[in-house]
């Protein structure tokens, strides 16, 4: 895959937006302008594209190498077709692309609870497991949270509890038109990385994990173009999180630019562990792990959750000239207090109770 910063020869929109012109540009190695990419996704979201066109588009884009402009056009189209969440953007998302095939516990979901209990509002966007045993939606259900809620109900959860969950099939119903072609071709394409960029609440900040090394800088580029504050991360062991088994690569997105650097958890006092110590099971197993964490259990899972919660807190607050290590150290203290005070466990209970009431009244 070519470098995400490589430039094709197409600096403007295509002379005519048709599938032959779009696919011809991609197979010739030419980049699409934002509006051309948006047109293609609009056609898909409107059920105006055939399965062959959708499959060809995903594969051709993958073979050429996606650019931030293309990914932004696709994501903007998806958001245009999504159901809107009536909250302001002063919220944070903690989400990964999935696809790392590590079968770890649900680190980002647990971190979301910790961050929300610290007083920072969270709107998480996710789905059921695709390549793992337990996705964010699966473990939340196992924890008693009702996930099939609409925009107004999610907004109420954010207002009253400090956290909400946007279940992707509810908020992106038009994406179903791409489902069959994606399943038939059976390889990861750009569709696999759009989730973290299409949160219907449009949060201004985020901790975004990307399992695909060729796309992490592209995702960061989109967030920079939007003016977001974010940390886009990939563990050097392949995790779509900040890992504690080795170092991680971090793209710091701030003020419209991206800075890339490495990070070693030992630099802020977190010991390295084996990846096996972070592995989980099905939704019920991972929910039990989450409950023990919220009850105060220490160990490798707590360290990984605290680290990722700290990163989300740092992304929300901004580094403000501090080093990444300083920002994460401050976030660690906040996250630890969120668990140790009982606030995170209490928040889960309130959230589950509220969503149960909202679901039963629908």
Curated annotation (Swiss-Prot):
Entry binding sites for 5-phospho-alpha-D-ribose 1-diphosphate: 96, 99-100, 104, 106-109, 124-132, 136
GO cellular component: cytosol
Transmembrane helix is among the record's keywords: no
GO MF annotations, alphabetized: anthranilate phosphoribosyltransferase activity; magnesium ion binding
Sequence intervals crossing the membrane: none
Pathway recorded for this protein: Amino-acid biosynthesis; L-tryptophan biosynthesis; L-tryptophan from chorismate: step 2/5
Keyword terms: Amino-acid biosynthesis, Aromatic amino acid biosynthesis, Glycosyltransferase, Magnesium, Metal-binding, Transferase, Tryptophan biosynthesis
UniProt key word Metal-binding: yes
Annotated residues for binding of anthranilate 1: 96, 127
Family that this chain belongs to: Belongs to the anthranilate phosphoribosyltransferase family.
Oligomeric form and interacting partners: Homodimer.
UniProt protein name: Anthranilate phosphoribosyltransferase
UniProt organism field: Rhodococcus opacus (strain B4)
Lineage: Bacteria, Bacillati, Actinomycetota, Actinomycetes, Mycobacteriales
Gene assigned in the entry: trpD
């Amino acid at each position: 895959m070519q470098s995400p910063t490589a430039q094709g020869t197409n600096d403007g929109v295509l002379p005519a937006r048709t599938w032959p012109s779009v696919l011809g540009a991609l197979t010739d190695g030419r980049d699409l302008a934002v509006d051309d990419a948006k047109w293609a996704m609009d056609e898909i979201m409107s059920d105006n594209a055939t399965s062959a066109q959708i499959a060809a588009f995903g594969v051709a884009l993958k073979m050429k190498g996606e650019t931030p402009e293309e990914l932004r056009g696709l994501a903007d189209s998806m958001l245009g077709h999504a159901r809107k969440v009536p909250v302001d953007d002063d919220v944070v998302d903690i989400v990964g692309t999935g696809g790392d095939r590590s079968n770890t516990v649900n680190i980002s979901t647990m971190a979301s609870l910790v961050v929300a209990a610290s007083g920072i509002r969270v709107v998480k966007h996710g789905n059921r497991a695709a390549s793992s045993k337990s996705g964010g939606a699966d473990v939340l259900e196992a924890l008693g949270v009702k996930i099939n809620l609409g925009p107004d109900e999610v907004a109420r959860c954010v207002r009253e509890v400090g956290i909400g969950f946007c279940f992707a099939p509810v908020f992106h119903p038009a994406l179903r038109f791409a489902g069959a072609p994606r399943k038939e071709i059976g390889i990861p394409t750009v569709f696999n990385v759009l989730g973290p960029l299409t949160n219907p609440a449009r949060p201004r900040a985020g901790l975004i994990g990307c399992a695909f090394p060729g796309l992490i800088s592209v995702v960061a580029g989109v967030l920079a173009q939007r003016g977001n504050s974010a940390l886009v991360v990939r563990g050097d062991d392949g995790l779509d999180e900040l890992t504690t088994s080795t170092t991680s690569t971090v793209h710091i997105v701030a003020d419209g630019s991206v800075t890339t650097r490495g990070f070693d958890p030992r630099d802020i006092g977190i010991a390295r562990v084996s990846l096996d110590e972070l592995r989980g099971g099905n939704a019920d197993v991972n929910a039990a792990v989450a409950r023990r964490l919220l009850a105060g259990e220490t160990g490798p899972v707590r360290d990984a959750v605290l680290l990722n919660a700290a990163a989300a807190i740092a992304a929300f607050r901004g580094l403000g000239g501090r080093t990444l290590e300083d920002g994460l150290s401050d976030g660690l203290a906040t996250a630890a207090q969120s668990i140790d005070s009982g606030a995170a466990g209490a928040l889960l209970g309130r959230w589950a109770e509220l969503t149960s009431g909202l679901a039963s009244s629908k």
